[in-house]
Curated annotation (Swiss-Prot):
Highest classification ranks of the organism: Eukaryota, Metazoa, Chordata, Craniata, Vertebrata
Pfam families given in the database record: DUF2462
InterPro entries documented for this protein: UPF0390
Biased composition (Basic residues): 28-37
This protein's name: Leydig cell tumor 10 kDa protein homolog
Amino acid sequence: MAQGQRKFQARKPAKSKTAATASEKNRGPRKGGRVIAPKKARVVQQQKLKKNLEVGIRKKIEHDVVMKASSSLPKRLALLKAPAKKKGAAAATSSKTPS
């Protein structure tokens, strides 16, 4: 058996763009609901406001829960951040060290 790993891995040839789009069309219907974006400016503005309110409310609730949990625990609560969605990013580390 050879020592170490091969320098260049064998790869499949890349699909052409037309073949890739054709395979996407042949995949069939996708799961989940679809939201059709509104065309009227007022409705767009209302949806944007609604989304921002929902996000704000959710963040406030999460913050309150964390504060309540950390105040009732004898030692400090360690929060972990979700990993970034960038390619090649290292694993996420917590901003506070768990003890």
